[in-house]
């Protein structure tokens, strides 16, 4: 599913607003021990973002690349911008940036993902974050995860993923190392138990 076709269809039992948690036997190395926040899931496919994968890029690098600041400005960036989290959102369009954020910031280009979370992919929100006018909670992701029609359903049927309702706190927590274990805990599963079950599958 392309980002431009992002829509929601919760009434038909799709998984938008849920986490996908990779099983230990996940065949695609892009998703090993990943937690994916599903933003849209319809008969046309699905798209979402990995929320526990680091990206060796700083927010200042993004601003410089977009010509929003110069080197002198980069040195003077306030702490909130200097420390703003950048993550790897997935293997599709890795050069493109997306901001998941709380709904206290909305622009004409913002797309509601849930009652409390929106998605914006324009320069306006990048400028707002750098100026201290951005949302209270946000993270920038480079790239996204996408599935074609029926692809995600097939992966779930083949035991590639577990799923559960998403946690806003987990999405925006800047500590990434334990997100996989914490996502499993949402459904009462320990990593050790999951690994043992997978080994006997």
Curated annotation (Swiss-Prot):
Transmembrane segments: none
GO cellular component, one term: cytosol
Gene3D superfamilies (alphabetical): VC0467-like
Domain of life assignment: Bacteria
Family: Belongs to the UPF0301 (AlgH) family.
PANTHER family: UNCHARACTERIZED PROTEIN YQGE, UPF0301 PROTEIN YQGE
Stated name of the protein: UPF0301 protein Avi_1069
């Amino acid at each position: 599913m392309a980002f431009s076709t992002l829509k929601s269809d919760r009434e038909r039992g799709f998984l938008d607003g849920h986490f996908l948690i990779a099983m230990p036997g996940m065949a695609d190395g892009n998703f090993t021990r990943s937690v994916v926040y599903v933003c849209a899931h319809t008969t046309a496919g699905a798209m979402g973002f990995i929320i526990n994968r680091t990206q060796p890029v700083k927010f200042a690098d993004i601003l410089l690349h977009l010509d929003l600041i110069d080197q002198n400005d980069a040195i003077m960036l306030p702490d909130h911008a200097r420390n703003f989290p950048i993550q790897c959102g997935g293997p599709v369009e890795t050069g493109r940036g997306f901001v998941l954020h709380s709904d206290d910031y909305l622009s004409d280009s913002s797309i509601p993902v849930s009652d409390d979370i929106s998605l914006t992919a324009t320069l306006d929100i990048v400028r707002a974050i750098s100026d201290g006018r951005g949302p209270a909670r946000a993270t920038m992701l480079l790239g996204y995860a996408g599935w074609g029609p029926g692809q995600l359903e097939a992966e779930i049927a083949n035991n590639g993923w577990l799923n559960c309702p998403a946690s806003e706190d987990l999405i925006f927590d800047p500590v990434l190392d334990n997100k996989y274990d914490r996502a499993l805990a949402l459904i009462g599963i320990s990593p050790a138990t999951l690994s043992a079950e997978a080994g006997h599958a």
